[in-house]
């Protein structure tokens, strides 16, 4: 998809779909004010509200409302922007858009207003993505994290780190010009120390971005275990509703069941699965295959065992969970144990029926979801998978640069620093291909 042209004027409905009290049509581009004049809004002044009747080509009134002009470059897109605020009737809003197109505008593509804001330097790529994340936020915590990303909290940290890597690269490339001199005499120790500090900063930024990604996307947690361990009962207890069928018959669950729950503003998707065991009929075996497939994309495995027979339960699971990096072992049905029974100290003892241990389970889930410091949200920002991937590449190149410096391979070290800087530039859009930009903005809402 090609990037937006600043010579055209675009139009779209900017308010939410459906019927509402107020509807907004947004224009952006060089003809915005001229089109507004043809609609019947004459002598507009920037940043003043003008009451007007919006008319069609025959002079008939389409609607009446308020018109606002945000003159370039003092607007969201950096261009002349006119917003027409009328009644929230989809029929009237579509008619108003059609009239603007008759007057020379064209229908905006999804995300094209934000794309123009990016191209005109009003915000960087991470901030533009934060707009979509703010709109789609499912809870207050995610919304606040997206707001911080939109305010530039994430971008500023990325830019500061990129600047540090640039300075280090300048020192390394300067040393290349004096190849006959030992690196230490050219400030090599300071470069290594500086790179070490930059790697620490990068590692922390990566951890924070991963946490921000979880805030945006939520966590995929798979309930896994042998039949009749109480996985479905536990899902119902955590969800607060009878989402899964529960019986005393082993193998009741044959398919996967997804249920999203909120943990203090964090979304956790629980996946109930078929119990793992040897044998079973064809349908049950297919259910077990799907359970293992869910584990392959799980962020967290909730291993549910019957506390009355832990060894047999562990044997039934086998190596199914080995591929999941994070696991939480849950000993269910603890209410059926005698007082003398002892459980693994690293596991959580719960009863899905009585509710015993569920509060502790919630606490552990929060900690696993967001890591250390889950109660400190002041610095949280939203992030996306591509941001995390870019930071990981930057970390790999920074580590490689440190290794090459140790061998005094200055040309290779300089190249690794360049690649680390390039990976960071992809986050903010300073170094992004047009096809990547097009893919990102096409996922936005129309009118944004």
UniProtKB/Swiss-Prot annotation:
Mg(2+) binds at residues 232, 253. GO terms for molecular function: GTP binding; GTPase activity; metal ion binding. Gene3D superfamilies: P-loop containing nucleotide triphosphate hydrolases, Probable tRNA modification gtpase trme, domain 1, tRNA modification GTPase MnmE domain 2. (6S)-5-formyl-5,6,7,8-tetrahydrofolate binds at residues 26, 83, 122, 448. GO terms for cellular component: cytosol. One of its GO terms (biological process) is tRNA methylation. The keyword Lyase does not apply. K(+) binds at residues 228, 247, 249, 252. GTP binds at residues 228-233, 247-253, 272-275. Its cofactor is K(+). Its EC number is 3.6.-.-. InterPro entries: G_TrmE, GTP-bd, GTP-bd_TrmE_N, GTPase_MnmE, MnmE_dom2, MnmE_helical, P-loop_NTPase, Small_GTP-bd. The keyword Transport does not apply. Binds 1 potassium ion per subunit. Pfam families: MMR_HSR1, MnmE_helical, TrmE_N. Residues 218-370 form the TrmE-type G domain. It is an enzyme of class 3 (hydrolase). Transmembrane segments: none annotated. Exhibits a very high intrinsic GTPase hydrolysis rate. Involved in the addition of a carboxymethylaminomethyl (cmnm) group at the wobble position (U34) of certain tRNAs, forming tRNA-cmnm(5)s(2)U34. Homodimer. Heterotetramer of two MnmE and two MnmG subunits. This is tRNA modification GTPase MnmE. It comes from Xanthomonas axonopodis pv. citri (strain 306). The gene is mnmE.
